[in-house]
């Protein structure tokens, strides 16, 4: 690969290693230019240029989704509310999405997954 500095080649190599490691762990990505980029994000001003995901990204277009998020340092009530809210929404056929941060986000996803959510 001529025309690249050693630092640029190292960055390219690191990105390729990271991509392979992510794929080995079932983590993929898509950009706004990809066909499987969620339609619901395309219409948003300043939508993410890149999103990482696990599982079937196509369900983002096939089902209703809602983000359930909250504090990383949540109270017991916050944990319970996050869990129960996601449980209820999942039972109504709604996908739960968030950034999987510690705290409320984690309990929200656990509420979805414990109830066969997507």
Predicted feature locations:
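Short, small/acidic-rich helices and loops at N termini and domain boundaries
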Residues: 1-35
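Glycine-rich beta-alpha loop segments
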Residues: 30, 36-118
């Amino acid at each position: 690969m001529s025309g690249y500095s050693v630092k640029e080649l190292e960055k390219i190599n690191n990105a390729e290693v990271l991509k392979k490691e992510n794929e080995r762990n079932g983590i993929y990505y898509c950009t706004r230019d990809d066909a499987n980029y969620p339609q619901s994000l395309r219409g948003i001003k300043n939508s993410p240029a890149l999103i990482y995901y696990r599982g079937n990204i196509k369900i983002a277009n096939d089902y209703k989704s809602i983000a359930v998020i909250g504090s990383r340092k949540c109270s017991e009530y916050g944990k319970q509310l996050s869990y129960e809210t996601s449980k209820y929404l999942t039972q109504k056929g709604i996908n739960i999405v968030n950034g999987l941060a510690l705290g409320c986000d984690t309990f929200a996803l656990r509420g979805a997954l414990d109830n066969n959510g997507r």
